[in-house]
Amino acid sequence: MGEDPTAQGIDINIAGNSRGSPSSYFSPYKNPNLKDGPKGEYLTDRLTDEAIIILEKFKDDPFFMYFPFYSIHTPLQGRKDLKKKYLNNKLVHADYAAMIECLDENIGRLMAALDELGLRDNTILLFSSDNGGIRKLSKQDPWRAGKGSYYEGGIRVPITVRWPGVVEPGSTCTEPVTGLDFYPTFLDAIGSSPSPGKILDGRSILPLLTGKGSFPKDRTLYWHFPVYLQNYAGEEDQSRDAKFRTRPGTVLRKGKWKLHEYFEDGALLLYDLENDPGETHNLAQEKPKKLQALKEDMYAWRKRTDSPVPSKRNPKYIPQKISTR
């Protein structure tokens, strides 16, 4: 939503700003868009309190609530009463586990509030994450790597949808979708459409939710990141190398096939996710026709979207060995 969510059409902004992580999960929060509570108040609890107040205020009106809990994000600071439960468990990170339980608890509070306000049957509830977990704290197996990576451990996350009377409870769908699909889906659900001239990269997944209508099989999804993401100073996370979480490149997925291209050395990594979900065996040499077809698709998309691709090497760059797996 950027530095100021209200510039994107949001009417009320509570605690949202350009930072992806809080200064502290305990008050005082040092957040310009959230008044401090009593000393020691826990951020996840406080944000849920604020969300419930908003629900109560607008329960008789149509509303859209975008509620990105800061949790579970660094700094890892679990609520003290929950952290105590995990201190003697050597198999888990006590703060991390406490933060997960607190998040789960507060999602339950939010759902209970919808029920109590009579909003359950007329509200679409969608829960997901913007990335995979931090591998050194929580392995994503069988997916490779973790947050910040193009590998499945970094970009594959579950989505849970509750929509009484529309989405069948307990049903599942294996069709890959992306966060870019949420906005057009919500528009479709309320019978609306984008503003004239508005170009959307995603598409409505309403047919997948309702089981009605058609949805393109094996559509192509793209990820493009032409810069470096964080020097990890050798921390092992199963990414392409231990130096950076992500290096400049583009990734494409079409059906069971996934293609990585890295700009520094032109490396092409081709994986069959159906038979190799952990992305361990590069098929670029074994499947030249498939590689070429996906590469042409990728290049055409970059041209169509005018995606930037770095063309000049940093004069201070010192080549180092990079994995080709």
Feature map (PLM): residue ranges:
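Loop/turn elements at helix/coil->beta-strand transitions in domains of secreted/extracellular proteins
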Residues: 9-11, 59-65, 119-125, 216-218, ...
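C-terminal, low-complexity/hydrophilic appendages and adjacent surface loops
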Residues: 147-152, 223-284
